[in-house]
Curated annotation (Swiss-Prot):
GO terms for biological process: 'de novo' IMP biosynthetic process. Mg(2+) binds at residues 276, 288. ATP binds at residues 118, 159, 199-202, 207. N(1)-(5-phospho-beta-D-ribosyl)glycinamide binds at residues 26-27, 86, 295, 375, 382-383. Transmembrane segments: none annotated. It comes from Pyrococcus abyssi (strain GE5 / Orsay). Its EC number is 6.3.1.21. It is an enzyme of class 6 (ligase). Involved in the de novo purine biosynthesis. Catalyzes the transfer of formate to 5-phospho-ribosyl-glycinamide (GAR), producing 5-phospho-ribosyl-N-formylglycinamide (FGAR). Formate is provided by PurU via hydrolysis of 10-formyl-tetrahydrofolate. GO terms for cellular component: cytosol. Residues 123-319 form the ATP-grasp domain. Belongs to the PurK/PurT family. This is Formate-dependent phosphoribosylglycinamide formyltransferase.
């Protein structure tokens, strides 16, 4: 692991600090932009050319990140100061080997290994971190899945043991849904579905993400700093809108910090963790953990001061730089600048060379802006952009973000124009 840092070099010179992004989506793009602002050299890797982060990196490589030899060829050539996984589909053996050879994997290889596998993560949350979660069971056959769902009770959730972005998950309302849940896990998981986890349904008030960041303080000690919890909702298992602050009780907020601290202390390392939780009244349950910036955390591009979005916080931690904070009742808190919200811009069709219109109207709305990710290909449900909005009232920010997102239309080379109004579930307007 790196040491506390007081100096930085200059990109593309022999004094440069280098970061290697394994995954080059919209989250990696924002990390790269923050790195550019500090003169850090950026190398971006992904499975396809011209991925978002590649468009703002110094160099890029295209290849299969499940291929250990490919990853080693890049690492040996670039010799990065930090290797930053941005996605789940990465060869884990390679990450452990990089650490063994003295490379800094963010936050560490073990945390990545745990977080991307739901059984390892759930056992870590319950047995090591000792934090509350929903009840759960595992199934490896269809008969076991019927039995597990019956014991957990309906409704419940089934999820492939290794996946991301809600792929391979299903909301099971009764026994008649189980064959579909089995098929969903086996055919759509982004990873492995040799085992399926069945989770109790929590009738929560709000789903939140705590963006806990482990970093060196001004004295060179590792501390954890907590921004305000981010509220969000999902549609079909994928993030659709987020806002900060999350509008939860003071007691629940302190429990969020307590749970996030226990989890990140167990996982260790340096960097930002997106810790997903359910909140109902004053009760909080841990759900999942992402050992990297979180899609719901894009709201911090508006709600936090410049340079201190979740991406800026992650980069500071990775580089060994301090992050300001204030101790309040035993927790180190990061101040929010203004309440803000996000709303996604998603594709309804498949095709290349996406185009967007309605921007003149959208960009005329005060206290809102549009971020387009620059993805060269669209497919149904793919996130191609996001709207950021801010207001002294977080409810107004949520409405504004939603309103502006629904002003945007998009098309591809092979499709007609379509708007965002095809999806209105959970919307405010």
């Amino acid at each position: 692991m790196i040491e506390p840092r007081d100096e930085l070099g200059t990109a593309t010179t022999d004094s440069a600090q280098k970061i290697l992004l394994l995954g080059s989506g919209e989250l990696g793009k924002e990390i790269a932009i923050e790195a550019q602002r500090l003169g850090v050299e950026v190398i971006a890797v992904d499975r396809y050319a011209n991925a978002p982060a590649m468009q703002v990196a110094h160099r890029s490589y295209v290849g299969n990140m499940m291929d250990k030899d490919f990853l080693w060829s890049v690492v040996e050539r670039e010799k990065p100061d930090a290797i930053i996984p941005e996605i789940e589909a990465i060869n884990l053996d390679a990450l452990f080997e990089f650490e063994k050879e003295g490379y800094f994997v963010v936050p560490n290889a073990r945390a990545t290994w745990i977080a991307m596998h739901r059984e390892r993560l759930r056992e870590t949350l319950v047995k090591e971190a000792k934090v509350p979660t929903s009840r759960y069971m595992y199934a490896t056959t269809l008969d076991e899945l019927y039995e597990a769902c019956e014991k957990i009770g309906y409704p419940c959730h089934t999820k492939a043991i290794m996946s991301s972005s809600g792929k391979g998950s299903y909301f099971v309302k009764g026994p008649e849904d189980i064959p579909k849940a089995w098929e969903e896990a086996k055919t759509k998981a982004r990873g492995s579905a040799e085992k399926i986890i069945v989770e109790e349904h929590i009738d929560f008030d709000v789903e939140i993400t705590e963006l806990a960041v482990r970093h060196f303080d001004e004295n060179g000690e590792i501390v954890t700093t907590f921004p305000k919890p981010v509220g969000h909702y999902q549609i079909d298992g994928d993030y659709h809108a987020s806002w900060q602050p999350a509008e939860i009780s003071e007691k629940a907020e302190r429990e969020v910090y307590r749970i996030a601290k226990r989890i990140t202390d167990v996982l260790g390392g340096l960097g930002l963790f997106g810790v997903e939780m359910f909140v109902k009244g004053d009760k909080v349950w841990a759900n999942e953990v992402s050992p990297r910036p979180h899609d719901t955390g894009m709201v911090t591009l508006a709600s936090h001061p410049p340079g201190f979005s979740e991406f800026g916080l992650h980069l500071r931690a990775v580089l060994g730089l301090p992050i300001p904070g204030e101790w309040v009742d035993g927790y180190r808190l990061f101040p929010m600048l203004i309440p803000a919200a996000t709303h996604v811009i998603k594709a309804k069709v498949k095709g290349y060379s996406p185009r967007f219109r309605g921007l003149a109207k959208a960009l005329s709305v005060p206290n809102a802006t549009v971020r387009l990710f620059g993805k060269p290909e669209a497919y149904v449900g793919r996130r191609l952009g996001v709207v950021l909005a801010w207001d002294k009232d977080v409810q107004e920010a949520k409405k504004r973000a939603e309103m502006v997102a629904h002003m945007i239309e998009l098309r591809t080379r092979s499709s007609d124009w379509h708007d965002q109004n095809y999806e209105k579930r959970k919307h405010l307007l």
